[in-house]
Every structure is written in structure tokens, then in C-alpha cells.
Amino acid sequence: ICNVLRKELWDEDVNSAVGLLSGLLKNISIDYTLVNDVGNNEFWMSRACVYAQVKNRTLYSKSFGALGNALGKAIGAYYATRKPVVAFVGDQGFQMNVQELQFIAQHRLPIAIVILNNESSGMIKDREAMAGYTYSLHTTKDSGYGIPDFSALAKAYGISWFRADSDFLLGGIIEPMMIELLIPDNQILTPSLPRGRDMQDLEPRLDNLKYNK
């Protein structure tokens, strides 16, 4: 039954963020190491890796919750393998350790930094809504959260910057680069598994006709 459901629901939870990441991943060399930060971006990336059938070595933090770890982890992954690295990070996590750009730029490390920019503290904003709050606190642009001009930041460090869409091709990585993916600020993390439920009983719930097919 699990295999039947997997086939039937293969793209059920492929939202725009997962779609963008999947397009990027399909062109990545198998020799590259992928690293992920913490937040909604990490879960979208997990789904995209399955959807795009990626076989690269991929490093996650999962429940350790070390927001902002991606750049430091990417540096370590490069020196461990001496091969290019692609780091996936949200706009908030990126700002937690942005000073690591100096080391990456100074040593011209072949690291591509992919920023999933939804101009918000996405996971915390989602949890505020799930908890029933009718307002946000420092998680959205109108409640105190802000981001810099990433293209200007890349220029300041002497790093190439690109804004990517679903047709963007990530070729050979021979020096630092920054790639910005624009994610809608209303893109929430789904599905989710509420505490105490069976693992197949996710939210939002599937149409019974589809689930019982």
C-alpha cells in the first residue's frame, strides 16, 4: 500500500519552492556536496532531493536547530572533499553567519550559496499562525523583520550574484557565487504531522477518495 500511495501522490506536496529547487538540482554534478541550513528551506530541500532523485551527498542539521550553520558547514565540506559545494539557506539563516563570506571570498572557494528568499522568518511566522496569533512579531517586513540587498552584498565581497528561476542551469562551480531564489512570503510548510497522530495522518488532510483509492 505504501508503494501505491507513493506513486499516486508523487507530486502532491511539490509547491513552488520545491519546484524551483528541483529544477536547480537536476543539473548539479554528482561530485558536489550539498549542505542545508535550518528552517522551512531545509524541509523543501529534503522534498526536492527526493522529487529530483538526487544522489549527491547531502548534509542536514535536522533537529539540532543550528540556524545559520550552512556557510560554516559548506567551508568544512569543501576542505574535507576538495570538491565544489552548494549551500542552501534561507534569508534569515544566511544573515546569522554572513561574515563567513569573507573567508569564502578571500580564498575563492568553489561554493555556490543558494538563498531561498521569502523576505520573512518563515518557520517562526508559520508557527505564530498555527498557535492562533493574529499578529506577527519580527517575522515579517511589516512587523520588524528585514533583509539587505543580496546583490549588493555579493558585490561588496567580490562574489558573482544571480537571481534564478526554474530554467536556471547551475553548471561548473570554480569560484564563489550567490544564487537568489525568490519564494512567495505566503508559501507555508506543508504537509505537517501534528503531535500524537499516526505518521500517515498529515495536515492538510488528503481527499478521502484519493487516499482510499
Roles of regions detected by a PLM:
Residues 1-80:
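Active-site diphosphate/adenylate-binding microenvironment
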Residues 44-213:
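Thiamine diphosphate
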